[in-house]
């Protein structure tokens, strides 16, 4: 018998790209929120998912940079930082499914293979990219301080092309780090059929939310965001119409599994 949460499966499971659940995360999040054309968001949603109602801010978007450390329950990655650390940049919108309001990731890039495969298991549409973000410091002048006037920046590139860049100038402490990414995630997992006939071998609607969440003090400020064209990306279709604000916060959470809401959706 072979074991493993992902390929390659072996007798021991040690070669699997993904370690066993649960996964524990600690990281810093730089969030930029803005409004775009709701019809552009609608174009990114499956047929069984609808836009939020007009009074639920259907054009709201969160563009988030994250600098993560993540380990499995036995902490094996703590002694091997290359498997512990990764960065990602992702775009979150809100949507309605079965008369409930959800958050949903429509684009996401990561810089490690295990992070990409982990996302595919969870229904995140992860792709590989180059993700960079500035880190707050508490000593010296080699980085921004978490104080009024502190500037935090993030960049995203893929296939040698700059896709996005953001800057947040802090104003002061805040109660939260935005609102768009504050709901349970609704994702569609799928696997195209090997017959290449346009059908799927796997089609599921799933949801997930972290447990054992710990949050630092959030900071808010003024945000700037630029998106750039690429022949293989569609970020500019959801370009900002109105900037809402920027945020920084440290987050700790655990992913112990999700829930299948529907199989073979129409």
What are these regions (language model features)?
Residues 23, 65-68, 97, 102, ...:
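A residue-identity detector for tryptophan
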Residues 40, 89-92, 198:
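Short, hydrophobic/aromatic alpha-helical segments in well-folded domains
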Residues 68-165:
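Aromatic- and glycine-enriched beta-alpha-beta binding-site module
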Residues 2-15, 121-266:
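Interaction-surface and assembly-scaffold signal
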Residues 44-46, 55, 77, 107-109, ...:
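General "foldedness" signal
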Residues 1-75, 218-222, 230, 237, ...:
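N-terminal domain-onset segments
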């Amino acid at each position: 018998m072979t074991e493993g949460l992902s390929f390659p499966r072996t007798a021991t499971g040690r070669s699997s790209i993904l370690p066993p659940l649960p996964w524990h995360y600690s990281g810093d999040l730089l969030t930029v929120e803005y409004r775009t054309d709701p019809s552009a968001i609608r174009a990114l949603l499956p047929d069984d998912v609808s836009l939020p109602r007009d009074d639920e801010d259907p054009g709201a978007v969160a563009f988030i940079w994250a600098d993560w450390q993540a380990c499995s329950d036995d902490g094996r990655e703590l002694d091997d930082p290359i498997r512990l650390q990764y960065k990602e940049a992702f775009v979150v919108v809100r949507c309605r499914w079965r008369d409930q309001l959800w958050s949903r990731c429509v684009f996401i890039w990561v810089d490690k293979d295990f992070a990409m495969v982990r996302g595919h298991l969870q229904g995140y549409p992860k792709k590989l990219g180059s993700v960079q973000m500035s880190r707050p410091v508490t000593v010296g002048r080699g980085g921004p301080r978490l104080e009024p006037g502190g500037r935090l920046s993030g960049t995203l590139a893929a296939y040698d092309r700059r896709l996005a860049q953001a800057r947040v100038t802090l104003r002061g402490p805040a109660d939260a780090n935005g609102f768009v990414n504050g709901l349970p995630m609704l994702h569609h997992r799928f696997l195209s059929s090997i017959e290449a006939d346009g059908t799927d071998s796997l089609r599921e609607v799933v949801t997930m939310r972290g447990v054992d969440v710990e949050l630092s003090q959030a900071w808010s400020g003024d945000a700037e965001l630029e998106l750039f064209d690429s022949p293989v990306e569609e970020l500019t279709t959801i370009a900002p119409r109105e900037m809402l604000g920027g945020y920084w916060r440290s987050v700790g959470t655990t992913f112990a599994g999700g829930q299948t809401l529907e199989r073979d959706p129409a």
